[in-house]
């Protein structure tokens, strides 16, 4: 069956749902796709299509970041349904690093929970620029005052993590009630169901409040590999988000990081099961690569314009060490500390070889949470690194630092 072509008409925005497990993120994602499809007369994705990996079906929990697409009148969205369980924070980091904005889902019946805060902190750390809040399960709360208290609590929490609590849109509704109404009918216009209207109001706010991102289309092409699979008879496909630049079918690219750099040719491009001739910054794309076996390429590598980026094991970086209140370490650490460095879609263990004060460049014996330091790092595996690149430092399930590469050594 021939694939249809992807038509680029509206600006493309990457968005995601974040929040505590079972607060209704996946239900909301399904309600959004179905509501927008129903208003425009197309077909939306049902809940079961979004919770797509087999292990999620068994647990009813979203594990790997599911990608869905939908359109409002003004934009085309790629939607990442972010996992809500603590052990999947790693996925959230790679999923969230690709978000231009997020919808924070909070159950009106429970209010903010520990993971709500953890996801907000992560959103701050990985640089999600804007957040809109959906106060879900409104149908389960009889007392209007209770909902107002939850809303106040959410605004205070947003302020704590440096998001504008006062001006952030908070939309009340029930994803489940909207979804049930949408299941009963294929086409629905605005005004025909109050629960569906609340979902459409949410998306109006997302359209207005989350800015259209500036894409780096004029820089050399780079895509961090998120996933790899083989298509029988066609070859190996690498998927990921194009970070910068653009790529066309027939272009020669390099696969960089973790192993020897390899050169290959792009023989096919797809986005949401549609064919592309060219892919640009911001696209979530599948790329067919000539002569590459599934074993040759893995998550954490990058596909890039030849010569534009090289693999390295050692670099200097300016790093902020998070305080206990920000979710970081409670205790200091010393030279020789070996945490995980999260860069794009990969995490690699690295040893901190030296520590210097950010203020006067003097050697530091010990680093305390809250410090800003310059550190030299030696990674156990080479990955694609460049000056100005951001990364997170994590250990034992918590983010301990956030940094920027200041110098590439070797």
UniProtKB/Swiss-Prot annotation:
It is found in: Plastid, Chloroplast stroma. Its main location: plastid. The keyword DNA damage does not apply. The keyword Glycoprotein does not apply. GTP binds at residues 19-26, 81-85, 136-139. Its EC number is 3.6.5.3. GO terms for cellular component: chloroplast stroma; mitochondrion. Mg(2+) binds at residue 26. It holds the Pfam family GTP_EFTU. CDD domains: EF_Tu, EFTU_II, EFTU_III. Residues 136-139 are annotated as: G4. Residues 19-26 are annotated as: G1. Residues 10-214 form the tr-type G domain. Residues 81-84 are annotated as: G3. GO terms for molecular function: GTP binding; GTPase activity; translation elongation factor activity. Keywords: Chloroplast, Elongation factor, GTP-binding, Hydrolase, Magnesium, Metal-binding, Nucleotide-binding, Plastid, Protein biosynthesis. One of its GO terms (biological process) is mitochondrial translational elongation. Residues 60-64 are annotated as: G2. Disulfide bonds: none annotated. Belongs to the TRAFAC class translation factor GTPase superfamily. Classic translation factor GTPase family. EF-Tu/EF-1A subfamily. NCBIfam families: EF-Tu, PRK00049.1, PRK12735.1, PRK12736.1, small_GTP. GTP hydrolase that promotes the GTP-dependent binding of aminoacyl-tRNA to the A-site of ribosomes during protein biosynthesis. This is Elongation factor Tu, chloroplastic. It comes from Bigelowiella natans. The lineage of its organism: Eukaryota, Sar, Rhizaria, Cercozoa, Chlorarachniophyceae.
């Amino acid at each position: 069956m021939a694939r249809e072509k992807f038509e680029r008409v509206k600006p493309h925005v990457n968005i995601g749902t974040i929040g505590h497990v079972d607060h209704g993120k996946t239900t909301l994602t399904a309600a959004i796709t179905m509501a927008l499809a129903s208003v425009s007369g197309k077909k939306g994705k049902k809940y079961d299509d979004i919770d797509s990996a087999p292990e999620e079906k068994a647990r009813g929990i979203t594990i790997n970041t599911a990608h869905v697409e939908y359109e409002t009148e003004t934009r085309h969205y790629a939607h990442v349904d972010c996992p809500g369980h603590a052990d999947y924070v790693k996925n959230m980091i790679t999923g969230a690093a690709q978000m231009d904005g997020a919808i924070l889902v909070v159950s009106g019946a429970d209010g903010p929970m520990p993971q709500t805060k953890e996801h907000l902190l992560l959103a701050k750390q990985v640089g999600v620029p804007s957040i809109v809040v959906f106060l879900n399960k409104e149908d389960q709360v009889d007392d209007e005052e209770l909902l107002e208290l939850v809303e106040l609590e959410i605004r205070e929490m947003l302020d704590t993590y440096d998001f504008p609590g006062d001006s952030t849109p908070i939309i009340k509704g029930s994803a489940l009630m909207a979804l049930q109404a949408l299941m009963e009918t294929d086409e629905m216009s605005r005004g025909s169901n109050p629960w569906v209207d609340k979902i459409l109001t949410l998306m109006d706010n997302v359209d207005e409040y989350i800015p259209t991102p500036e894409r780096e289309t004029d820089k050399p092409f780079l895509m961090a590999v998120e996933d790899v699979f083989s298509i029988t008879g066609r070859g190996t496909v690498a998927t990921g988000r194009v970070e910068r630049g653009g790529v066309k079918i027939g272009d020669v690219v390099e696969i960089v990081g973790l192993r020897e750099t390899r050169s290959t040719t792009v023989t096919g491009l797809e986005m949401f099961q549609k064919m592309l001739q060219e892919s640009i910054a911001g696209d979530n794309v599948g790329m067919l690569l000539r002569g590459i076996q599934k074993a040759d390429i893995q998550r954490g590598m990058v596909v890039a314009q030849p010569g534009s980026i090289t693999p390295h094991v050692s670099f200097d970086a300016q790093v902020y060490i998070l305080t206990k209140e920000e979710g970081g370490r409670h205790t200091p650490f010393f030279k020789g500390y070996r945490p995980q460095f999260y860069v794009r879609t990969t995490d690699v263990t690295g040893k901190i070889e030296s520590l210097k004060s950010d203020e006067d460049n003097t050697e530091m014996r010990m680093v305390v949470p809250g410090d800003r330091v310059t550190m030299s790092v030696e990674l156990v595996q080479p990955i694609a690194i460049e000056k100005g690149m951001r990364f997170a430092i994590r250990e034992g399930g918590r983010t301990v630092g956030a940094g920027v590469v200041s110098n590439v050594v070797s």
